[in-house]
Amino acid sequence: MGFASASREEKLKMLKTNKTRKTTKHLNRLAKRKKLSREIRDGMADIKSRKSADLRQRAVNIEDDFIADRQAHYENSDEDLPLDMMDADIDWENSAFANAKRRLEKKRSGVESDSDDEDDVEKKKRKFAGLLEEGHEELLPIKLKDGTLIRPTREKEVKEDEEEKSGDEEEEGEEDEPHREDFSHLSASELIAKRRELMQEFKDTIASHANMLLSNPQVNIVRLRDLYNLCNGEKIHSLVRESVQKLAIASTLQVLLDILPGYAIREQTAEEKAQKQKKETRNLVNYEESLLRYHLKYLQLCEKLSNKLVGKDRHNDESTFTFKMGILSVKALARIVVSAPHFNYSTNIVSSLVRLSLAKNETVIREVCEAIRTVFKEDIHLKITLFTARSISTLVTKRKGRVPPELLRTLLSMNITEVKDEDKKSGKDALIAKKYQIKKEKASKTAKKYKKQLARLEADLLEVEAEESMSKKLKNATEAMKFAFQSYFSILKRMPNSALLEPVLEGLSKFAHLLSIEFYEDIVSTMENMVQNENLKSLDQLHCINTVFVILSGDGQLLNIDPSKFYRLAYRVLNHLPFEKRPEQRKNQIIMAAKTLETMLVIRRKAVPLSRVAAFVKRLLSIATVLDDFPALCIVSLVRSLFIAHPKLSSMIEDEEGGAPGIYRPDIDDPDVANALASDVRDELSMLARRRNTELSRFANNILYGVPSTGIFKLNPQLSSLKPWILMGQLMDNAKDAYDKVESKYLDDLEKAAKKRNQSVTPKNINFHISNWLAASK
């Protein structure tokens, strides 16, 4: 179309274009001669930039579409979890990772297209002009009246022979797949060699995938999908499937632990997805989403395999493949939550582990509880501690207390020493208001005075902010302790068997100082009722007594409670210590007795009469004479601290007869009427000083000679400053022989002496026999 035949509007447009072109050429010539000002040059550059903006945006869109298409292809090529995950015995919809999986799928569905595989760009063949589609043939062309040529096509007819041939080829191809290859014709030696060959191939494959992931995880993240498929046993011959699955699960675990970032991956919001992102940012987001997806799939697989171990008499045979895969999955979940408690789905792993503690197999329970215990010990911010305590409390309530004792014992490892004081309020708001007031009055103040006041206020504000950050940890600690006490009270309410009482009472004894004051009277009343139960073990009785005195030593001292009954109970329990034959139980009893008596007689020394303390000293040293060396050392060290806290006890080691009138009654289980001040402890200390254990002999001589701090009977300050139970633990650890057997030599000698009188030694008369035995040994 020429200029003459064009319409008026088209002519104006053409004139405008020609004029613009001439003006542009003229300006370019002037620019080359450097005769244009900077403003005009900048204006020309801006016009060029705006004209080419569409082209640049089109190029960016093409690149973004290509990246999105590649990502969609990788995601569509991922295979969903196998249908056998929906086993009837696994409530998969209520599993720990079900909600996480649904959220991830919902997120993916928002950005993925719903196109079928046949519409995938990569799977489509390119179409060029003049080429026919596959499966079509061209017919004779048809020429129309206006000269246009039409080239009709039709589908090719496939011959039956060709169809059968192609079908046979497909079947042969399927049979040639490695995981379907038939080795039944091989001999035993050939089968072993073939298995070794296949295993080596899969080992090389796993090593290659792992190496690529570790060298550049962001580029090779798709290899994590290949490792997951091997964990699932896909395309692996049955000859080596079990071994390859175990190897793949262990290798994938280590790879995940090495590439997991040191932060939790946050899901992007809809606004963030709609925003334009840099290429590096988009690649990082795609990598994080892929890592999170495969990490979740791996956790779901481990949960599925480990859940097969839970139930009545379920797969307790440790030689089966199901059990081996289950225990391997339990260890994998445990290692992930211990090594990366900050990462996504850590709370889901904790929920799964807590539920796995209901397994009937001791190995599973031990692995689960050890992982939970480690999480408690290493948790700094107490966030995962709070969630774990809540999960345990929920399980205890749901199961009505029918949980393993080991699970409750894990609560003892919580790293909590204080809780938040609800009455203490932060003064941050008041300080901020004061800061604005000072700035408002700046004009009426001198510069020096203004800076001084502002600096002091800023320092106070920083201190308050530091306290608030610390209060978040205390808040988590407070909530965690609430759930722990809820578990304890739920079990005490139902009065279960003694196996559950021991960890509950031990927990109450350890955390009694963190109890809220409104529970004090109820706890003391409950402990009083329980400790009077004759079937309660000595260790549990000591836990009850210690709980009461921890309460009474703190805020509970304002309660109107007479503790004398608990002193009598503790005095009576001491007679049972020599009769415990199990080393671990004896050690725990001695430690608990030492802690309880220190609270009763040292911390509360101002509220305890001297006659009562003397009775405990006399009975403790009498019992120590028939104990083996390490427990005896713990008791003697405790008695030494009593002599320091109560100096008037020195009358019990003096040679002169200046004690209280009357006689000592060792057969009475009441320390207030035993009249121990009328006796002495020189015989007991002399016998203990003759022991072969060097430290025990030194401690006994130190007490016997008035607890001197100088001279030949002084003690090593590094040992004498330790708590009695810590001293015993250190010496046990440093001993050449492990404390795996209770030495009953001294108790046997006592029983032989009693047998000569045709009597037997019992907790009720042991002090009477010890007095006669010591008198005969002089």
UniProtKB/Swiss-Prot annotation:
Residues 160-176 have a biased composition (Acidic residues). GO terms for biological process: DNA replication initiation. It comes from the Eukaryota. It is found in: Nucleus, Nucleolus. The keyword Nucleus applies. Residues 433-473 form a coiled coil. GO terms for cellular component: nucleolus. GO terms for molecular function: chromatin binding. Keywords: Coiled coil, Nucleus. Residues 101-122, 151-186 are annotated as: Disordered. Disulfide bonds: none annotated. Belongs to the CBF/MAK21 family. This is Nucleolar complex protein 3 homolog.
